[in-house]
Amino acid sequence: MLSESLTKTKLTDPLILDLLQNIREHRSMLEDLVSIKIDPNLTNIISNEIGRELYIENEFHKAKGFRKLHIEVAEFSKNLRILHCVFFPDPKFDIPIFGMDLVKINDIVSAAIVDLSPASQNQGLKYEKLLSQVDKSSFSSLREIPKWGGIFSNNVFFASLKRNSEKNDFCRVVDQYLSILIKLSNKAKAEVDKEIIQERIDFQKNYCVQQMKNEKTSMVLLKYFDEKWVNNYIKTVLFDF
């Protein structure tokens, strides 16, 4: 069932709303920003079945330098809330992949991750120093990167957030990573060399393939949808290439 903008009507979680506003503000800074039409059955999804309540809202845009800007907000059974965001660059431009995920169970943030992941060989040399200068010293519960996490930069940030101060600091880190992304995108020029473009395409394909190894994504969705729907959603909405 389709719904109106759920983030305007149902979502009340202050942390997710703060992050969402920040991401949207940075997205609005991009040139030639336009929305992308996706199958409406995969855009806004809502169920009021008792014990299996859920809503999923997706936003899709593209802009100069970016082939897809995706934001997903989801709530499952009134206690599991997820904010997922990936900005996929246009392979013609030498821009990293921005990714951010927040998983909140009741009031506990079990996972908070943000990164600018390399989308070409040695690309990280252009921005790793900038990421390393972002202060992350206040976090007490850093988490181990999963085995498939070789796609991330050396400065990927992954933690559980225990205190309110850590939640505020995570918003700051996301803001600074996004600001670095915007600066990089403003400097990027379109490439014409087909081999270089193909290398960037291959990097994005590998990014998506590795992300799909995260079994937690499908485990949550399979509680509400059949396997065919889940596979299509993951490959079409979350990690297409």
Curated annotation (Swiss-Prot):
What superkingdom does the record give?
Answer: Bacteria
**GO biological process annotation, one example:** phytochromobilin biosynthetic process
Does this entry carry the keyword Oxidoreductase?
yes
Q: Provide the catalytic activity annotation.
A: (2R,3Z)-phycocyanobilin + 4 oxidized [2Fe-2S]-[ferredoxin] = biliverdin IXalpha + 4 reduced [2Fe-2S]-[ferredoxin] + 4 H(+)
Q: Which GO terms describe its molecular function?
A: cobalt ion binding; phycocyanobilin:ferredoxin oxidoreductase activity
Tell me the enzyme class: oxidoreductase
Alphabetically sorted, this entry's keywords are: Oxidoreductase
Q: What is its EC number?
A: 1.3.7.5
HAMAP family given in the database record: Ferredoxin_bilin_red
Q: What does this protein do?
A: Catalyzes the four-electron reduction of biliverdin IX-alpha (2-electron reduction at both the A and D rings); the reaction proceeds via an isolatable 2-electron intermediate, 181,182-dihydrobiliverdin.
Q: Which family does it belong to?
A: Belongs to the HY2 family.
Q: What is this protein called?
A: Phycocyanobilin:ferredoxin oxidoreductase
Source organism (scientific name): Prochlorococcus marinus (strain MIT 9215)
